[in-house]
């Protein structure tokens, strides 16, 4: 009995230990999601904002019901109780959506689970719910679970994925097949289906980066019965695996950082990409880290990088371009938020200059001398130095005069080198007023200083040099008003100048510089007088004002100077001009003519001008009517009665308001016409009546008739003469002695009667060496009565003689170089060989006609 009791106690103790140990083991709790993947099913592809999808559960092991969740896809929001809702509208393009969810337990450890939102068909009535006793057709449907396959799966292949079925399979045997991309379309053969069971299998390894999903279509047909199921689309989703490293978009990255950039400011960004799924997984979530910095000065961690964005910023102060102008950073990009695959890149950072060095003048003081009265003169150049980067805005300089130039006489500008200030004068300096200027000049950069920097200052002492200045008229332009009828010699006004060189005690003399009308004179004391009569109506007077240039000259020995002043005389008008009619010639008809409008001008101004008065003078008042038009500014003139055609002088005396007048003569051409159609005929010529014209024409005709009768008489008388009218001393029959030196041509000894009669009226003139051509004899002009026409007369008769076939031999072409046989004249050498004149026989000269009678009488043995 004791033994049984002992055994019983041992069993009880053993059971207690077992249960106690089991209880202890069961009491250990591990925080985490209750599922690795939560699936939420929806019945449509378009999900609206605010829709509640489901709930994820997380065990904290501390009894808390609320947990901090974070969705990788920002379109989904997870409350602390695990409820998943949509923040904005989502469309399931592939029929599903997968994203990651993070949760943190009480110790701060992060946990991750997947959430899958997939579309499923609306719930259809299953075959178990159909009342077979009712004679009703039941709507059929497919049973297709979601299909997903992980990329890079190693099989074995073919690897079953899911089994699809149709409700017709309850009634009859079905044969299944699939079509679409990956089945019978490229890429072909990736997916297959068992014809009778409906198992869908994949035949090879898939790559999501090449194709993330495949769209198939399922078909079912009856084997034993004529049954065909409506085709159904199937989406096969390839889930991502982290099989791609991040890749930097460029390598290296280049950036610039100002040496005075504040801490935390981002100045450049590096980026990398990952081909893995970024929407549904964290396989493409990249984290950036700086691995090394070269040079590690002044501190090894001068820069920081944002792990998510890749933005690089300044972490520590101390960048100095003058010491370390470039840094090289080695950066890694790791996916899965820094826990996956990684790659390495480089960022090259160039430190750009900041204005941390103030420009400094090379000297603290300068001295310069400038002559007075000169503008634009360079006073001094102030060179500076700057330790910043050359040609940068932190290096180039600008200047300012801060003291010593209250009058604004100087300007300072940056020189071509951009490291010098150039002071110039912008106003003329006056030695007599200020002999010395002390200027304070500062220099700064175009860019602002970084931090508090001292400003360099220089002092410039400018000494003004005295030069001889021209006398100055005060005022430089003087206005006076005087009447234009001032008598010659009258004083107008004293116009004097002062010498600004008060220390020299110089004398000033005056001259007239420019006096266009020569009206003025100036005395040695500067008194301006009237030299010639003034005239306000002169062309040199503009707007009633006359300007003259006055000169003032000093007597400096080295460099005498001349000052100028302008005298403006406003001439007051007086009545010294009579009115004038502008139109001096008019034309009008003598019948029904409209009045001719005349305008009157007066050089004088009111009240010395209009209204005007007009008085016809002499016979004008008898033949012409003169009156003003309705405006009173224009004068109308017309004949009082019908006048004969001709030229008339119309004399009008025009007077102004004060009676200043003068006569105006208007030449009026009157034509025998009507109205305004002015057109003259030949009825009158130069004012001579018609009968006078006829008388003149008759006299001319009578004179022409008498001249014709006289000419006929002379021709008849000339035909009755037997002997030619050749004077004894005809120029062509004279013997000239050419051995007389100094003798001239008697070019005035010609017989006009020979030219007058013509050769055709002299029957004794003939040629026996030319056959007659029976051409009509030319007609020669008679001798003109007017001696001035002799030239024309000779030219015309010369042309007629050239064409006359009966012209004498001296008018024909002679060949003088032929002296052969048959020539009656023989050779000229015979004149020398003959012993006397009797050896020659000159009887043939008698045959040459009367033109050679004189020669025949001398040598032919005839009468003396």
From Swiss-Prot:
Keywords: Calcium, Cell adhesion, Cell junction, Cell membrane, Cytoplasm, Endosome, Glycoprotein, Golgi apparatus, Membrane, Metal-binding, Phosphoprotein, Repeat, Signal, Transmembrane, Transmembrane helix. Ca(2+) 3 binds at residue 274. Residues 1-22 form the signal peptide. Residues 714-864 are cytoplasmic. The modification Phosphoserine is found at residues 753, 823, 829. Expressed in the skin and the ovary (at protein level). Pfam families: CADH_Y-type_LIR (PF01049), Cadherin (PF00028), Cadherin_pro (PF08758). Disruption phenotype: Morpholino knockdowns show lethality within the first 24 hours post-fertilization. Embryonic blastomere cleavage planes form at irregular intervals at one-cell stage resulting in blastomeres of unequal size. Discontinuous and abnormally formed cell-cell junctional complexes are evident at the eight-cell stage which results in asymmetric blastomere cleavage (1.25 hpf). As a result embryos do not form a compact cell mass on the top of the yolk cells at 1.75 and 2.1 hpf. Gastrulation is initiated at 6 hpf despite epiboly being less than 50% complete. It is found in: Cell junction, Adherens junction; Cell membrane; Endosome; Golgi apparatus, trans-Golgi network. GO terms for cellular component: adherens junction; catenin complex; cell cortex; cell-cell junction; cytoplasm; endosome; Golgi apparatus; membrane. Glycans are attached at residues 271, 344, 457, 459, 496, 555, 562, 564, 566. The keyword Cytoplasm applies. One of its GO terms (biological process) is cell migration involved in gastrulation. Ca(2+) 1 binds at residue 243. Residues 147-248, 249-361, 362-473, 474-581 form the Cadherin domain. It comes from the Eukaryota. Three calcium ions are usually bound at the interface of each cadherin domain and strengthen the connections, imparting a strong curvature to the full-length ectodomain. Interacts with ctnna1 and jupa during early stages of oogenesis, interactions are no longer present when the oocyte develops into the unfertilized egg. Interacts with ctnnb1 during oogenesis and in the unfertilized egg. PANTHER family: CADHERIN-1 (PTHR24027:SF319), CADHERIN-23 (PTHR24027). This is Cadherin-1. It comes from Danio rerio (Zebrafish). The lineage of its organism: Eukaryota, Metazoa, Chordata, Craniata, Vertebrata.
């Amino acid at each position: 009995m004791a033994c049984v009791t002992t055994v019983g106690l041992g069993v009880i103790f053993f059971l207690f230990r077992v249960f106690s140990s089991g209880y202890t083991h069961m009491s250990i709790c591990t925080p985490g999601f209750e599922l690795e993947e939560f699936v939420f099913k929806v019945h449509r592809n378009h999900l609206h904002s605010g829709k509640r999808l489901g709930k994820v559960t997380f065990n904290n092991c501390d009894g808390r019901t609320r947990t901090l969740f974070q969705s990788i896809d920002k379109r989904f929001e997870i409350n602390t109780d695990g409820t998943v809702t949509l923040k904005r509208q989502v469309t399931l393009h592939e029929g599903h959506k997968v994203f990651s969810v993070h949760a943190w337990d009480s110790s701060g450890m992060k946990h991750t689970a997947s959430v899958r939102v997939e579309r499923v068909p609306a719930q259809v009535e299953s075959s178990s719910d159909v009342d077979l006793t009712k004679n009703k057709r039941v709507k059929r449907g497919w049973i297709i679970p979601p299909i997903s396959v992980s990329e890079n799966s190693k099989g074995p292949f073919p690897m079953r994925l899911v089994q699809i079925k149709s409700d017709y399979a309850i009634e009859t045997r079905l044969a299944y097949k699939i079509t679409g991309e990956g089945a019978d379309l490229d890429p072909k053969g990736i997916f297959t289906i068992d014809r009778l069971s409906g198992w869908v299998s994949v035949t090879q390894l898939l790559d999501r980066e090449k194709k993330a999903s495949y769209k198939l279509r399922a078909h079912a047909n009856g084997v034993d019965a004529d049954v065909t199921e409506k085709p159904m689309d199937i989406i096969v989703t390839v889930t991502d695996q982290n099989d791609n490293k991040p890749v930097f978009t460029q390598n290296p990255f280049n950036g610039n950082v100002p040496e005075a950039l504040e801490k935390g400011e981002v100045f450049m960004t590096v980026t990398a990409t990952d081909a893995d799924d970024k929407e549904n997984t964290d396989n493409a979530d990249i984290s950036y880290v700086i691995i090394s910095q070269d040079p590690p000065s002044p501190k090894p961690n001068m820069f920081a990088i944002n792990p998510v964005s890749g933005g690089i910023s300044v972490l520590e102060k101390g960048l100095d371009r003058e010491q370390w102008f470039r840094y090289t950073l080695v950066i890694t990009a790791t996916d899965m938020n820094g826990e996956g695959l990684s790659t390495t890149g480089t960022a090259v950072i160039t430190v750009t200059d900041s204005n941390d060095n103030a420009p400094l003048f090379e000297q603290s003081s300068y001295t310069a001398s400038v002559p007075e009265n000169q503008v634009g003169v360079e006073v001094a150049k102030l060179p500076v130095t700057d330790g910043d980067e050359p040609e940068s805005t932190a290096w180039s300089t600008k200047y300012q005069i801060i003291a010593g130039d209250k009058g604004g006489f100087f300007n300072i500008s940056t020189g071509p080198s951009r490291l010098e200030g150039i002071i110039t004068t912008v106003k003329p300096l006056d030695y007599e007023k200020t002999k010395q200027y002390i200027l304070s000049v500062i220099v700064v950069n175009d860019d602002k200083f970084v931090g508090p920097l001292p400003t360099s200052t220089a002092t410039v002492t400018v000494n003004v040099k005295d030069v001889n200045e021209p006398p100055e008229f005060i005022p430089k332009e003087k206005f006076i008003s005087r009447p234009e009828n001032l008598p010659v010699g009258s004083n107008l006004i004293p116009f004097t100048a002062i010498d600004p060189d008060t220390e020299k005690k110089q004398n000033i003399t005056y001259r007239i510089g420019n006096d266009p009308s020569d009206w003025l004179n100036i005395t040695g004391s500067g008194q301006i007088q009237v030299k010639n009569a003034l005239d306000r109506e002169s062309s040199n007077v503009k707007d009633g004002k006359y300007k003259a240039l006055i000169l003032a000259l000093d007597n400096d020995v080295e460099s005498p100077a001349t000052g100028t002043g302008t005298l403006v005389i406003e001439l007051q008008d007086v009545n010294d001009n009579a009115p004038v009619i502008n139109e001096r010639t008019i034309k009008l008809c003598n019948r029904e003519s409209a009045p001719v409008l005349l305008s009157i001008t007066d050089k004088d101004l009111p009240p010395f001008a209009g209204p005007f008065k007009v008085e016809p003078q002499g016979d004008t008042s008898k033949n012409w009517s003169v009156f003003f038009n309705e405006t009173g500014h224009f004068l109308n003139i017309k004949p009082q009665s019908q006048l004969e055609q001709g030229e008339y002088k119309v004399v009008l005396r025009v007077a102004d308001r004060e009676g200043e007048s003068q006569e105006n003569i208007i030449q009026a051409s009157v034509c025998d016409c009507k109205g305004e159609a002015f057109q003259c005929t030949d009825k009158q010529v130069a004012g001579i009546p018609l009968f006078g014209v006829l008388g003149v024409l008759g006299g001319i005709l009578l004179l022409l008739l008498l001249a014709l009768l006289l000419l006929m008489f002379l021709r008849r008388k000339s035909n009755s003469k037997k002997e030619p009218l050749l004077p004894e001393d005809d120029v062509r029959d004279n013997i000239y002695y050419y051995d007389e030196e100094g003798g001239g041509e008697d070019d005035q000894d010609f017989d006009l009667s020979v030219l007058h009669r013509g050769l055709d009226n002299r029957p004794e003139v003939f040629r026996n060496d030319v056959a007659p051509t029976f051409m009509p004899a030319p007609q020669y002009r008679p001798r003109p009565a007017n001696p001035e026409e002799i030239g024309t007369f000779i030219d015309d008769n010369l042309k007629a003689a050239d064409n006359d076939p009966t012209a004498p031999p001296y008018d024909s072409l002679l060949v003088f170089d032929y002296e052969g046989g048959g020539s009656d004249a023989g050779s000229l050498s015979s004149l020398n060989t003959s012993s006397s004149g009797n050896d020659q026989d000159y009887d043939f000269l008698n045959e040459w006609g009367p033109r050679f009678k004189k020669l025949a009488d001398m040598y032919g043995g005839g009468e003396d």
